Amino acid sequence: MADVHALYDQADQLKLEGNLEEAVAKYQEILAEDSNYVLAHAAIAVVQGRLGRHDVAIEHAKRVCEIAPEDPFSHTQLSVIYQRAYAGTQNPQYIQDAEDAMARSQMLQQGQQ
């Protein structure tokens, strides 16, 4: 079994160096070991968004919210991923989705469920 923390550090370094495809592959290695490793899902969402793969980015950002449903930041990140997807596609549905995710984040921050 690989050390997911070491793999994450390696993937993060690849991302910083601009090796985005390699970073995604390394993050996927992490998920093969631990499918609920939230940091890997969050990082994949960001990297896939940069690569223009907005559907995949959204899928991973949603997974973060499933793993950590009470974490306001998870929903804020989902909102940002939707905003970037809108910028890349001009699909107006992404704006509504972004607003919904941000509203959920704000409710959680205010202690509402």
Q: Language-model features: where?
A:
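Alpha-helical segment of the N-proximal tetratricopeptide repeat
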Residues: A2-E29, E33
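Structural signature of tandem alpha-helical TPR/SEL1-like repeats
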Residues: E17-K26, L51-R63, A85-A103
